[in-house]
Amino acid sequence: MNKLVKIFMFLLLSSCSAIKKEVIDCPKLTSFKEAAEVVVKSEKNIPVYIGIRGVQTYCTDDNNDVDMELSINIRAIRNDTSIEDYVPVNISVVSLDASKNEYERDDFSYSQFMLKNSRIVDRSTQFNLSVPKGGEVLLGIR
């Protein structure tokens, strides 16, 4: 009986250690200026500046890949605050392998609500992406 308990405890503890992933350095993340800041037209045809205002990353080892979690803060700024409006935002995150070939892509589109009298609105959006080891990530808005 004692031997059975020891075997059970060993299996339980060894399986728990396999669940925890190893945290590693994240691959290179790049956003070209043309893809990091854009001026778009709102639904009511008013120009609105959209820009990336921060990125947080968390990466873990996943065999041949890196599992990358991103939190991207997008800021919308407008001058005309007299009306409520919606602004279209399109975010693309692309992982590339070492040969610069597309490995995985995640595109996300939404309408950012601009409340009356609100000049600046921030929104954080989460992504999860697989990146091959030795690869990199490109980030852009349009």
Regions found by a protein language model. Name each.
Residues 88, 131-142:
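Short, surface-exposed ligand- or partner-binding patches at beta-edge/loop junctions that are enriched
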Residues 87-98, 141:
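Extended low-complexity, serine/threonine- and proline-enriched intrinsically disordered segments
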Residues 24-40:
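Predominantly extracellular/luminal regions of secreted and cell-surface proteins
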Residues 107-135:
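Short, solvent-exposed, Trp/other aromatic-anchored flexible loops in extracytoplasmic proteins
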Residues 56-69, 78-85, 130:
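Short, solvent-exposed beta-strand/turn "edge" segments of beta-rich domains on protein surfaces
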Residues 2-10:
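Sec-dependent signal peptide recognition
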Residues 35-66:
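Post-signal-peptide N-terminal segment of Sec-exported extracytoplasmic proteins
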